[in-house]
């Protein structure tokens, strides 16, 4: 996005007396694919074919009579670019998209999605009010937040559809816990508020383990049934949903009316489900190649010492681009289809890799930081081990800090 465009967006927001709710998300027209590879220091390659394959694979698994799908596209479609992927969701006939920010809602609508937009987290009052044009279905899990949303709806002479989040599975994040006596009273009070219309009941599983999911599922069945009966809700107008990616693959009892797959749509799935393809690759190019003698140290704090005369390739990205410092002296990248080690500490804008054992490495050569090159692959499990966290902890940031190129 051009600096002038961003400045104009911020000024308009200030003039309107509104804060910018989330980072601006560019539309596909802003992605100049022909220029990305040669002009950017690093980029993401997004495989639309793989994304559409994953959607169809899931649809085939669920069957025509199975639950509906709500494609979770929060965090800018897990860093993949919601503007790039929404057209595929529309083409596949997916009836619901789950998002977090109003920016994601705006982009989804502008890209032609006319179905249900469900926010998958609690929202601030300002967010709720600013989301009214997008016909958002909000999430509520407390009487206080429900009252706030109802007040906004009444002020604007409208009704806001809401999903009631239950803490049945023990996430203790958004949901109301009906095992507490006063919470049952609060839940019933929510249903009586003018300005909000219950359209869903949901819970979220905190652990990817079958028995834990089944335990939370049993409580959710009790809680949702109590709420339907005590609240005298019309079951035909309520969408009950609980299954995340793990439960969608492993626990069919959690399907109910709708499933909420996130990671699996992008190929971030249980390793044994190899039919789901990775959608993202993270790439850069060699900026320069330098020759250094044995005994030299590399990078800040001298954390790596060369054991031989070495050729080091300078890669023009660092932790400001989402390549974590935790990967220093542990990770590897792919050049010429071969694994080469990261040496020295990751800098703000630079990492160094040892290419001594390769021939003819030169500026402009493609480097794969995550993904495949020839028969070699930078594996998810390896990066997660080096980083000490889920890969999503990194790739969602990659998406915000690097341009995207559609793989043709």
From Swiss-Prot:
Keywords: Disulfide bond, Isomerase, Periplasm, Pyridoxal phosphate, Signal. Its cofactor is pyridoxal 5'-phosphate. The active site is at 74 (proton acceptor), 300 (proton acceptor). Its EC number is 5.1.1.10. InterPro entries: Ala_racemase, Ala_racemase/Decarboxylase_C, Ala_racemase_C, Ala_racemase_N, Ala_racemase_pyridoxalP-BS, PLP-binding_barrel, Racemase_Bsr/Lyr. It holds the Pfam family Ala_racemase_N. It is found in: Periplasm. Its main location: periplasm. GO terms for molecular function: alanine racemase activity; arginine racemase activity; lysine racemase activity; methionine racemase activity; pyridoxal phosphate binding; serine racemase activity. Residues 1-21 form the signal peptide. It comes from the Bacteria. GO terms for cellular component: cytosol; periplasmic space. The modification N6-(pyridoxal phosphate)lysine is found at residue 74. HAMAP family: Bsr_racemase. Amino-acid racemase able to utilize a broad range of substrates. Reversibly racemizes ten of the 19 natural chiral amino acids known, including both non-beta-branched aliphatic amino acids (Ala, Leu, Met, Ser, Cys, Gln and Asn) and positively charged amino acids (His, Lys and Arg). Is not active on negatively charged (Glu and Asp) or aromatic (Tyr, Trp and Phe) amino acids and displays minimal activity towards beta-branched aliphatic (Ile, Val and Thr) substrates. Homodimer. This is Broad specificity amino-acid racemase. It comes from Aeromonas hydrophila subsp. hydrophila (strain ATCC 7966 / DSM 30187 / BCRC 13018 / CCUG 14551 / JCM 1027 / KCTC 2358 / NCIMB 9240 / NCTC 8049). The gene is bsr.
